[in-house]
């Protein structure tokens, strides 16, 4: 089920109108794209502020109810106050079920504790990336991509091309030939030398 949010349409624009909305605890925003016209909206600031703290809100299809009319959207941009805990503006993009969407989804790492490089060699896994941009139809959008680290050995590098993707999901960067590292297994300084010395002394 999509995450649901409620909004009101708004007719007043500009800095002054937006400031008055914020004083009232409302958050100005806009819905655009999907073949429709841009729709200025306002939302409850407190509700959106806490929703924005969750990864799933940033990487999921959202159902937004504007004056009783529901649309499916993606979160596209958030403008934060430079030093206050306040959202200044928020942008949503309409989606169409027959068109692919590009979304950054979180990477969910598993089995790091049983990786040979960790369990047997005392190494440490470093995550170069914690999210990745994917392309798919809205119906195929996953909440996250699972990254299995169970086979990582000392000094190994897990690349984007090593990720196991759900069906009908692509990584645009790979289509451009951009195969970036995702995780690396780093040995502690002097770890390998100590192991070799131990074997020799034995």
Curated annotation (Swiss-Prot):
GO BP term, example: translation
Keywords: Ribonucleoprotein, Ribosomal protein, RNA-binding, rRNA-binding
Recorded family membership: Belongs to the bacterial ribosomal protein bL25 family. CTC subfamily.
Organism: Nitrosomonas eutropha (strain DSM 101675 / C91 / Nm57)
Disulfide bonds, paired cysteine numbers: none
Domain of life: Bacteria
Annotated Pfam families: Ribosomal_L25p, Ribosomal_TL5_C
Self-association and partners: Part of the 50S ribosomal subunit; part of the 5S rRNA/L5/L18/L25 subcomplex. Contacts the 5S rRNA. Binds to the 5S rRNA independently of L5 and L18.
Name under which the protein is recorded: Large ribosomal subunit protein bL25
Any one Gene Ontology cellular component term annotated for this protein: cytosolic large ribosomal subunit
Ribonucleoprotein among keywords: yes
HAMAP family, per the entry: Ribosomal_bL25, Ribosomal_bL25_CTC
PANTHER family assigned: RIBOSOMAL PROTEIN L25/GLN-TRNA SYNTHETASE, ANTI-CODON-BINDING DOMAIN-CONTAINING PROTEIN, RIBOSOMAL PROTEIN L25_GLN-TRNA SYNTHETASE, ANTI-CODON-BINDING DOMAIN-CONTAINING PROTEIN
Its biological purpose: This is one of the proteins that binds to the 5S RNA in the ribosome where it forms part of the central protuberance.
GO molecular function, one term: structural constituent of ribosome
């Amino acid at each position: 089920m999509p995450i649901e949010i409620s909004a009101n349409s708004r007719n007043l624009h500009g800095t002054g109108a937006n400031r008055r909305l914020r004083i009232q605890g409302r958050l100005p925003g806009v819905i655009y794209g999907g073949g429709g016209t841009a729709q200025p909206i306002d939302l409850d600031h407190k509700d959106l502020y806490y929703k924005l703290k969750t990864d799933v809100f940033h990487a999921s299809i959202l159902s937004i109810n504007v004056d009783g009319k529901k649309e499916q959207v993606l979160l596209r941009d958030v403008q934060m106050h430079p030093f206050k805990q306040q959202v200044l503006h928020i942008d949503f993009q309409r989606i169409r079920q027959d068109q692919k969407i590009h979304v950054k989804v979180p990477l969910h790492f598993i089995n790091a504790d049983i990786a040979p490089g960790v369990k047997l060699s005392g190494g440490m896994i470093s995550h170069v990336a914690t999210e990745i941009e994917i392309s798919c139809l809205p119906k195929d959008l996953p909440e996250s991509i699972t990254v299995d680290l169970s086979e990582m050995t000392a000094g190994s590098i897990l690349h984007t091309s090593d990720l196991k993707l759900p069906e009908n999901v692509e990584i645009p960067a790979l289509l451009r030939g951009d195969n970036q590292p995702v995780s690396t297994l780093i040995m502690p300084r002097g770890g390998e030398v100590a192991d070799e010395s131990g074997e020799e002394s034995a």
